[in-house]
């Protein structure tokens, strides 16, 4: 998206990843999203969003793709807390993977630090017939 979308993307990210904090803690700084878009492997066509009926961003999936290695990494996948448990995370990630397949992608790397995200990745990547799963046991 363009600069007009930055506040909405930042707010959706806050609602997805800081659901246990009061909204008054949100500082409104969306410079991180502009920085994300300046990354060499960022592609707008792999920055997928799902909109709520009111037009707000309900879910998002940002993927970086390297044409040379035909590899990708999921950078951000999130669903605003008020839209959890509606299948939106799975929908945006599945759409991102569909786009990667059309580009000729052969490998996708995803990592999660919390069980809900890990379960989402496992369910989707299993459906995509991924054969290599790496698990680091701590």
Q: Residue locations for each model-derived region?
A:
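Conserved active-site tyrosine of GNAT-family acetyltransferases
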Residues: 120-126
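Conserved catalytic-core motifs of GNAT/GCN5-like acyltransferases
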Residues: 109-111, 126-138
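A short beta-loop-alpha structural element at the N-terminal edge
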Residues: 1-11, 22
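A structural microfeature
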Residues: 58-59, 89, 130
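Short glycine/proline-centered loop/turn elements that form peptide/ligand docking sites
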Residues: 93, 114-117
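Conserved GNAT acetyl-CoA-binding A-motif
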Residues: 100-113
């Amino acid at each position: 998206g363009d600069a007009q979308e930055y506040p909405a993307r930042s707010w959706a990210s806050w609602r997805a990843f800081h659901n246990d904090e009061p909204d008054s803690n949100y500082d409104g700084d969306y410079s991180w999203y502009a920085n994300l878009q300046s990354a060499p492997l960022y592609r707008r066509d792999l920055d997928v969003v799902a909109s709520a009926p009111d037009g707000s961003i309900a879910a998002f999936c940002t993927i970086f793709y390297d044409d040379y290695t035909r590899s990708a990494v999921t950078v951000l996948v999130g669903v605003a807390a008020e839209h959890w448990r509606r299948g939106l995370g799975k929908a945006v990630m599945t759409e991102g993977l569909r786009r990667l397949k059309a580009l000729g992608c052969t490998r996708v790397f995803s990592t999660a630090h919390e069980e809900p995200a890990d379960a989402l990745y496992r369910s989707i990547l299993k459906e995509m017939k991924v054969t290599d799963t790496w698990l680091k046991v701590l």
